[in-house]
Amino acid sequence: MGISRDSRHKRSATGAKRAQFRKKRKFELGRQPANTKIGPKRIHSVRTRGGNQKFRALRVETGNFSWGSEGVSRKTRIAGVVYHPSNNELVRTNTLTKSAVVQIDATPFRQWYENHYGATLGKKKGGAHAAHAAEVADAKRSRKVERKLAARSGAAAIESAVDSQFGSGRLYAVISSRPGQSGRCDGYILEGEELAFYLRRLTAKK
């Protein structure tokens, strides 16, 4: 018995069983879920209707995530699933699907910010961070670069909820692609009201 997307096997609105008047059709087929996990990249191609292809990501460990307010995207490592709007089981098993809230490595975005604005993120108290901040501030730059950084300094401020995440080296992000269909696990960093909403959900879950 294959997975079928037809409705002929369902009972009618009054509860009566429907008579089977035809067999299952190829165009009504369904497939098993990909249940994409975090691990070394493993992608299978699936032949679909019309000779087209889908790419079934069985395991991925990186994705292309965008930082909307800064207009920048970077490829980064996915650390784990922390929240899922539809199913807690997907959080427990670290399953990557569209709309899953994940934690990603903040390093590529922190490096971009330090290069672009000449300032550090994630104010941690401690000698190592203070030394790194001083290193970034005192780095040798040409006068042209100094002028560029001075012009950008007005836009350097980011919201505190995102800044504090840089201190831990992990950022909350949402997956917006469909790993089981496209074979990619891309998304965007959570900010503003959306971040506040998911932070409330995460604290309520605990």
UniProtKB/Swiss-Prot annotation:
Residues 1-37 are annotated as: Disordered. GO terms for cellular component: cell surface; cytosolic small ribosomal subunit. The keyword Ribosomal protein applies. It is found in: Cytoplasm. Keywords: Cytoplasm, Ribonucleoprotein, Ribosomal protein. PROSITE patterns: RIBOSOMAL_S8E. InterPro entries: Ribosomal_eS8, Ribosomal_eS8_CS, Ribosomal_protein_eS8_euk, Ribosomal_Se8/biogenesis_NSA2. GO terms for molecular function: structural constituent of ribosome. The keyword Metal-binding does not apply. Its main location: cytoplasm. Belongs to the eukaryotic ribosomal protein eS8 family. PANTHER family: 40S RIBOSOMAL PROTEIN S8. Component of the small ribosomal subunit. Mature ribosomes consist of a small (40S) and a large (60S) subunit. The 40S subunit contains about 32 different proteins and 1 molecule of RNA (18S). The 60S subunit contains 45 different proteins and 3 molecules of RNA (25S, 5.8S and 5S). This is Small ribosomal subunit protein eS8. It comes from Candida albicans (strain SC5314 / ATCC MYA-2876) (Yeast). The lineage of its organism: Eukaryota, Fungi, Dikarya, Ascomycota, Saccharomycotina. The gene is RPS8A.
